Amino acid sequence: MTRPLLLLGALLLAACAGSPPPAAPAPAAAPSGPSCAAALARAGFVFEPAPDRDGPGDCRLRDAVRLSRSHVALDQPLLVSCPTAEHLLRFEADVVQPAAQRHFGQRLARIRHFGGYACRLRNGDTRAIRSEHALGQAIDIAGFDLADGTQITVARHWGEFGPRGAFLRQVAREACSIFHVVLTPRTDALHRSHLHLDIGRWRRCDA
C-alpha cells in the first residue's frame, strides 16, 4: 500500500466515531479466549494471536488476533480483539455474502478496510472519550470487491440509486443486528467514506 493510502487510513481512524451515542448499553460481547480462536479457525480464518497491549493512557488490547484473511481476502491485515473478529465472521456469512448474491448474483471476494485497533480518543480530540478502536473493538469498512472484480466503495456508491448503493445500505442495516454501533455516511461527514462497526457498550444504528 502506498504511503498516501496509509496516511488516509490513519486520518480516517482518527476521525471515526463522533460524539458518544446517547443509547442504552448493548448486550455483552461474544465470548473470548480459546473458544473464540477455535471458532475463527473452524470458519477458515487465517490469523495469528497478537500480544496484549496496555497504554498509553486508557488504550488496551486483550485477546487480540491479526487477521490476514477472513472468509474472503482482506486488502491489508486487520488487528482487532478476537470477539470483534468473531462478529466480522457473522457479518460476512449472514449479511454480506447473501446481499452480494441478491444484488449481483455472485460472491464477495475481498473486504477493503481502514483498520481496527488504533490507540486514540474519539475524533482524535483530547477532550473526548476513548474510541472503541482503542480497545480493538471496532472496524472501519471502506468497501467490497466481488468475484468478477466489481468494486463497491462507501465513498463513491453509498448514495447511488443502483445496485451498488442498495447493496451498501442493506449491508449497513443488517449489520445493526450483529454489531452494537453502526455509523455510516448518514452519521456525519467524518463517515462519508466508510462504515464504522463496533461491539462497544452502546447501541446506535445510523443505517
Language model region names:
Residues 102-136:
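Active-site-adjacent substructure of cysteine-protease-like catalytic cores
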Residues 48, 56-57, 62-64, 68, ...:
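Catalytic cores and adjacent binding grooves of peptidoglycan-active enzymes
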